[in-house]
Amino acid sequence: MSDGDYDYLIKFLALGDSGVGKTSVLYQYTDGKFNSKFITTVGIDFREKRVVYRANGPDGAIGRGQRIHLQLWDTAGQERFRSLTTAFFRDAMGFLLLFDLTNEQSFLNVRNWISQLQMHAYCENPDIVLCGNKSDLEDQRVVKEEEARGLAEKYGIPYFETSAANGTNVSLAIETLLDLIMKRMERCVDKSWIPEGVVRSNGHTSADPLNEEKEKGSCGC
């Protein structure tokens, strides 16, 4: 797909404590590579990827492919950048929330990140996929899978154990998030309403500031 040759531009935000592997996961997804020498993200960065999304119809048939331009925003996990990070929450349509399977505190902080999303995202029930990263470091693991899955079930969000080093479940996690977003858009009664994190190929968003309160209750929020 050439520049501008897409149906939707969709913004994802990767969140989580510093050092959980957000940059490495996004790099693995967009480039299929792992770089163990990434330095800590300062502020905000992003990567891009073009994909084709095909949804199954009610009869099981695969529908027309939607051409998606994904912007994957990479945020700093340090507390001193928190105000900058939260400023980007409303502009994103979906959230990839990561913790480090070898760092219990990063898992305990997942609740705080979700609380921040509920306060600052485009609606109180945004689409989130939870990822326990660094699954390849099994001998260093301190967070049990059943504990992480239990937390995800409490919030009603999908959970994957990922590895930026070998690519395990990285694409699946992001594809699941995209599927959630596209289905949310399909549920919109008024198809002219699309959250601010989605831009049509003509460059227009459909958010109307005069109807912001009405929009907060739209599309399954």
UniProtKB/Swiss-Prot annotation:
Residues annotated with Cysteine methyl ester modification:
221
Any single biological process term in GO:
multivesicular body sorting pathway
Catalysed reaction per UniProt?
GTP + H2O = GDP + phosphate + H(+)
Report the transmembrane regions from the record. none
Q: Which parts of the sequence carry Phosphoserine?
A: 2
Topology relative to the membrane:
Lipid-anchor
Gene3D superfamilies, per database record? P-loop containing nucleotide triphosphate hydrolases
Protein name in UniProt? Ras-related protein Rab-27A
Tell me which species this is from. Answer: Sus scrofa (Pig)
